Amino acid sequence: MRSGIIAKKVGMTRLFMEDGKQIPVTVLSLDGLQVVAQRTEDKDGYTAVQLGAGSAKVKRVSKAMRGHFAASKVEPKRKLVEFRVPADGLIEVGAEISAEHFLEGQKVDVTGTSIGKGFAGAMKRWNFGGLRASHGVSISHRSHGSTGQCQDPGKVFKGKKMAGHMGAARVTTQNLEVVKTDADRGLVFIKGAVPGPKSGWVTVKDAVKKKAPEGLPFPAALKTAAEAAAEAPAEGGEA
């Protein structure tokens, strides 16, 4: 089991394949994805890696977190996520993960916070069919109808599909295909839609319900020191 990655959702576009087919894809950006800390069995009781992504202003980071980043010799990050890994899957603190962590054609699971829709009725929230347009139905055309039984049990069961707050929830979309990766620009192109709005953070992991392809970099695809040094002047020039 490998570590996942943290990525920022850039938006959607389309890619043209060699046979002329066009595929809708979501573009995910790896923004300074680094290992911030390790969790070990001896010290923490489990093994995991803590990854950080995005750049945070120092004045917006708490004193405790500034010390945490300083101990790892890593710049303050906007987003931190832990990924459980086996002992041999631990990654060195400070290492930067590349977009080549995934292979083209590989299946992945993407987790994010869905776009909030506010209060929604049963037809929009749960795809209910609603009541009849006529034949005695007045006012209640879009209502959900009956919600339970009679005197026994005399209540509405928890989890009953009714009107309520829609979206803004943690959602995982499984078995999405990696169409293309661009290590130079730190981009991963995922077939179809992924949860969340533009500029939202998502996590991407190897699909749990599909067999991993051969040749996956283990424990991760890391950027070399030369690649990191080559990117630094370019980033400074853009700023």
Swiss-Prot record:
Modification after translation (UniProt): Methylated by PrmB.
Family membership: Belongs to the universal ribosomal protein uL3 family.
HAMAP family, per the entry: Ribosomal_uL3_B
Keyword hit for Ribosomal protein: yes
GO terms assigned for molecular function: rRNA binding; structural constituent of ribosome
Superkingdom of source: Bacteria
Coiled-coil boundaries: none
GO cellular component entries: cytosolic large ribosomal subunit
InterPro entries on file: Ribosomal_uL3, Ribosomal_uL3_bac/org-type, Ribosomal_uL3_CS, Transl_B-barrel_sf
Family matches, as Pfam families: Ribosomal_L3 (PF00297)
Name of the gene encoding the protein in the UniProt record: rplC
Subunit structure: Part of the 50S ribosomal subunit. Forms a cluster with proteins L14 and L19.
Disulfide bonds: none
N5-methylglutamine modification, residue list: Q151
Protein's job: One of the primary rRNA binding proteins, it binds directly near the 3'-end of the 23S rRNA, where it nucleates assembly of the 50S subunit.
Name assigned to this protein: Large ribosomal subunit protein uL3
